[in-house]
Every structure is written in structure tokens, then in C-alpha cells.
């Protein structure tokens, strides 16, 4: 079985400088799955933090409609992940596929709810109890 190496996404670029690979494992059998992820180096983590600091002012200046559209887009992308995603997560976690589908739906629906809150301007007045 060939192992596909997954890289870190930092400021729109792919990076895999770390020598440590985190292997995806079948939770039931313990056998390796065909994915390994590069553990980020300290420099990669620092680069990601710096990229976030640079990106924040631009995101902060967006209008509520743009932020809501961003949240909706994330929800749509999550929903668009097919059965391969569900099966892979089930193998990695040993959770039943129905549970994974439910968790995905819950997450995408929460993102859409947050988008509506932002869209209608309620986000600024909401406070935790």
C-alpha cells in the first residue's frame, strides 16, 4: 500500500518540513491507512501564526454579508465531502457512519446558523450568559 503524505496549509502554500509523520490508523484493526500527515515544525507553526496576524485586519474589515458567505461556503464544502470522507472518518474513529453523518450535519448547520446571526447583525449584541 502506498502512503499519501498530507501537507500543512500555511498562507495559501503547502508545507511539509517536519520529519515526523503522523500516520492514519484503522481504529478497529490498528493497521495503517493510506494517509500520513507531516507534523508541523516550530518554524511552520510560527509562519502560520504570522500569516494569521497578517490576514486578520483584512478579515476584520469585511462586511457581515461577506463573513456570512464565508461561513456558508465552509458549510457547503463540508457537506460536499462524499462517502469516502464518511468512511475514512469512521475507520479512524471507530464511530458508526451514521454518527459521522450526524456530526457533519450538525457542524454544517451550526455554521449556517452562525452565518445567519452574522448576516442579520446580531453577532455584535450576543453575549455568553
Residue ranges and their predicted role:
Residues 1-129:
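N-terminal Rossmann-like NAD(P)+-binding subdomain of aldehyde/semialdehyde dehydrogenases
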Amino acid at each position: 500500500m502506498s502512503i499519501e503524505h498530507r501537507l500543512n496549509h500555511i498562507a495559501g502554500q503547502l508545507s511539509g518540513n517536519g520529519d515526523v509523520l503522523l500516520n492514519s490508523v484503522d481504529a478497529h484493526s490498528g493497521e495503517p491507512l493510506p494517509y500520513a500527515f507531516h507534523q508541523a515544525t516550530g518554524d511552520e507553526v510560527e509562519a502560520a501564526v504570522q500569516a494569521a496576524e497578517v490576514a486578520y485586519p483584512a478579515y476584520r474589515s469585511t462586511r457581515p454579508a461577506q463573513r456570512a458567505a464565508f461561513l456558508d461556503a465552509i458549510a457547503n464544502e463540508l457537506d460536499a465531502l462524499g462517502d469516502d470522507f464518511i468512511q475514512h472518518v469512521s475507520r479512524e474513529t471507530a464511530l458508526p457512519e451514521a454518527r459521522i453523518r450526524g456530526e457533519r450535519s450538525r457542524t454544517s448547520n451550526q455554521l449556517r446558523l452562525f452565518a445567519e446571526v452574522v448576516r442579520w447583525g446580531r453577532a455584535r449584541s450576543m453575549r455568553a450568559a
